[in-house]
Amino acid sequence: MTLQSESRFYYQLLAAVLIPALFVAWAARLRQNRKYPPGPKGIPIFGNLFQLSTRPWIEFSAFKEQYGPLVYLNIVGQPLLITNTHTAATDLFDRRGGVYSDRPRSIVADYLTGGLYLPFARHGPTWLKLRRAGHAFMHKGVAHKYRDTQFKEALTLTHHLLQSPSGRRRQLFESAEASIHSIVYDQPSSGGPVYPKMTDFSTLINKAVTPLFTPAEFLPLMQYVPSWLAGWKRRAQQGFVLFSELCEGLLEEVAKRVDAGDDRPSMAGGLIREREKHGLTNLEAAWLSGMMILVGTETNTLAMSWFLYAMIAYPDKQKRCQAELDAVVGRSRMPTFEDLEKLPYLRATIREILRWRPSIPVGARHYTTKDDWYQGYFIPKGTICFPNVWSLNHDPAIYGTDADHFNPGRFIDKDGGLSPAIPATKDGAFLIPHHDLHNSHGLNPPKMQKVCLRFIDLHTFRSKYPLSIAVPGHVSYGFGSRICLGRHIANDALFINFASILWATSISPAMNANTGKPDVPDKLAYSNLGLLIVPTTTECVIQPRFDEAEGILAQTRELCM
């Protein structure tokens, strides 16, 4: 070996040693320089696990006071990010949806749903085509097609509430299930064998994503244990087969009516006709239809339960709704969808129910698909992100000092109309008086301009526009491409249910069996089932509001049958 070649060899050897060492040092320095969002200190291995209760939205909201709008946690090695302000939530989940629109993997849910249950599906080709197909039959432009069905079911629900003195939650659940079943499958649920199978699967799927439901979520190697040894895997696989058979059977019944030309507008019928257009397999179309039943029934039941609770806890709000109905509809006919635009306080009541008591207060989970930086903080790939809906919907800086209370009047402008709102959904723009956002004195010009309010910083908006112009709505339907597909249909159902019940009935607290006095509920109390919040009671006394109410209700039902 010559001196020159020997020197070259040593230089190459030195480079081979130094370059990796420098890279490791650089990577370590980079990690040190990464500034993670603030958050409470945890303990080794478990992190912040033991700092959370069965109501994590309460701890998340408390963290906001100490750490600010972003809170970073670690749960057994899994990074969590909590967003506690509208600005942070919309910045990340709306504007940066490409990074934050995925869902974290749930091993149990994967076996249970085969990746076909849209709310839990990972971002990818299957999720995308299911989402597009669902949107085609649930967007705002087609929601009106289902209003006849919703009107009939609202009349039936009002009738049952008047006839039966107890079992309110059961009545609300059966009504929601019947209405959505009719919309999806063009036939009301008979309460037969389909009903318990749907409810059983709903319970199973909610458990599947509940923390600590199975050790497999924290010990991924357990997924490779044979099903005959792993009871959780066996039950999940059986659940997938049973629910698939159920949904395929329901879809087949609709297909027969479509072939015979004997069907009315329905989501399943539309999916059958356009299945090839959307690239869906029969199993995917069946699961998409079944998903609509599961999600729609539970969320509608919860909203209706909170409606009854609010009406007995805040009787003055009930009376104001009824006064508006008397002024607009009168007492000679039932309210219809034709009255919707003329009932601003009733519509504000819907918005306030959804704001005041969101069904999932902690928000649906999002998942980062790559590293990101926000406001100087590093958010690593693989972080589970929660938009803390409870904190967002109860922010006193936006909704006022009474944000914890039920008050539809916060959405009524000085002229008595429904205020335009920072969208409760992600739909389009709102017409607002045109002026420069930096000029708070330019409200006189009559020119109107469309502004996408979703992407305006809410605190900036509130400081520039008076409350009579707009008040933010709610974020209970979610964010970005993960926003609830059926929100327009849900809003229609709530409107006609609220209107029918309040027009025909008076709602008052149930009598306490021990004291003989009305059992008025605590205005701020609630219970929780897993990550859902429910009223402490739905029992109440429902009576005809005036002498002719039951007769007009019966006549209207007969005409609609």
Curated annotation (Swiss-Prot):
Q: What class of enzyme is it?
A: oxidoreductase
Q: For this UniProt record, give its keywords in alphabetical order, as a comma-separated list.
A: Heme, Iron, Membrane, Metal-binding, Monooxygenase, Oxidoreductase, Transmembrane, Transmembrane helix
Which pathway does the protein contribute to? Secondary metabolite biosynthesis
InterPro entries in alphabetical order = Cyt_P450 (IPR001128), Cyt_P450_E_grp-I (IPR002401), Cyt_P450_sf (IPR036396), Cytochrome_P450_fung (IPR050364)
Which superkingdom?
Answer: Eukaryota
Is Signal among this UniProt entry's keywords?
A: no
The cellular component terms of Gene Ontology attached to this UniProt record, alphabetical and capped at eight, are: membrane
**Family in the record:** Belongs to the cytochrome P450 family.
Function, as annotated: Cytochrome P450 monooxygenase; part of the gene cluster that mediates the biosynthesis of the psychoactive metabolites ibotenic acid and muscimol. The first committed step is glutamate hydroxylation by the 2-oxoglutarate-dependent dioxygenase iboH, and the last step is decarboxylation of ibotenic acid to muscimol by the decarboxylase iboD. The order of the intermediate reactions is somewhat ambiguous. IboA likely activates the carboxylic acid at position 5 to introduce an amide bond, and the flavin monooxygenase iboF generates the N-O bond. There are several options for the latter step.
This protein is called what? Answer: Cytochrome P450 monooxygenase iboC
Q: Which organism is it from?
A: Amanita muscaria (strain Koide BX008)
